[in-house]
């Protein structure tokens, strides 16, 4: 058992390189490269333009030498620490302007990148979708905002309601009285008066009622006359039929078709047959 443990330690010591070597991949792509130098783990190194955005490990005193890439701004470690506390949409990217400042497109200088952009609230200022809960400037001031869909009383559009012409007490009383028919409740509304001295004739084909003609003079007012209901339909029939049609009689339908001479012979023949049957 001890031999196996010793062989394990020996293999672990032989596998660790004594000379710092740079591990390269076969495809030479943008992969993480690890260096071992006297048992100390150096910060990660990335081959590509994202080399400046990788923060170093904590506790490392040695700074990694980075190659200067033309066209990209190099940021210091203090600038990266300041960017970590900003909003996601307020981090300035190299080659384009910050979203919060709204400036024209251009490259960001290292001196400007070290100071975080300060936004001042204005009328057209758009709040970011991620915001902190503690705002030192506006912590003591709490405002109540109305939703967008709420309209104030003085902003609501005024709706004009058409007013009906004034009616007399007699007409209002007649409109409230219901009219009961065999079909159920049918409200009767008063017909509007036509200026000119005569009222409009209204014939209801469903009810079969014809109102009276109310003649009104221009100088005096005649109260509205109650309708006189004239029934043009039969109570037993479901179809409207005029009352002037002759009523069919069903009393002599069967008597006229039977011959009375035949009916008189039946009792005589019956009496003869009864007499023959008797012994």
UniProtKB/Swiss-Prot annotation:
The keyword Zinc is annotated on this UniProt entry: no
Biased composition (Low complexity): 100-123
Keywords assigned by UniProt, alphabetized: Biomineralization, Cytoplasm, Glycoprotein, Nucleus, Secreted, Signal
GO biological process, one term: positive regulation of epithelial cell proliferation involved in wound healing
Family annotation (Pfam families): ODAM
Post-translational modification: O-glycosylated.
Stretch list, region Disordered: 100-125
Residues making up the signal peptide according to the UniProt record: 1-15
Family designation: Belongs to the ODAM family.
Subunit structure: Interacts (via C-terminus) with ARHGEF5.
Record-given protein name: Odontogenic ameloblast-associated protein
Originating gene: ODAM
């Amino acid at each position: 058992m001890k031999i196996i443990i010793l062989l394990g330690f020996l293999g672990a010591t032989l596998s660790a390189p004594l000379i710092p070597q740079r591990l390269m991949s076969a495809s030479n792509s943008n992969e993480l490269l690890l260096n071992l130098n006297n048992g100390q783990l150096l910060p990660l190194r990335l081959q590509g333009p994202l080399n400046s955005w990788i923060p170093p490990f904590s506790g490392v005193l040695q700074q990694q030498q980075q190659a200067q890439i033309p066209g990209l701004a190099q940021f210091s470690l203090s600038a990266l620490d300041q960017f970590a506390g900003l909003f996601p949409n307020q981090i300035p990217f190299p080659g384009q302007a910050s979203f919060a400042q709204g400036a024209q497109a251009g490259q960001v200088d290292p001196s400007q990148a070290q100071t975080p952009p300060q936004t001042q609230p204005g009328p057209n200022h758009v709040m970011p979708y991620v915001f902190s809960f503690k705002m030192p400037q506006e912590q003591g001031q709490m405002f109540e905002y109305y939703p967008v869909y709420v309209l104030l009383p003085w902003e609501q559009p005024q709706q004009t309601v058409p007013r009906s012409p004034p009616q007399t007490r007699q007409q209002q009383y007649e409109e409230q009285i219901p009219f009961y028919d065999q079909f159920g409740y049918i409200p009767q509304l008063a017909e509007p008066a036509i200026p000119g001295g005569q009222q409009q004739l209204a014939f209801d084909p469903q009810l079969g009622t014809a109102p009276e003609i109310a003649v009104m003079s221009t100088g005096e007012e005649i109260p509205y006359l109650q309708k006189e209901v004239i029934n043009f339909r039969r109570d037993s029939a479901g179809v409207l039929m005029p009352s002037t049609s002759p009523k069919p009689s069903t009393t002599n339908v069967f008597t006229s078709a039977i011959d009375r001479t035949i009916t008189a012979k039946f009792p005589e023949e019956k009496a003869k047959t009864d007499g023959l049957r008797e012994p």
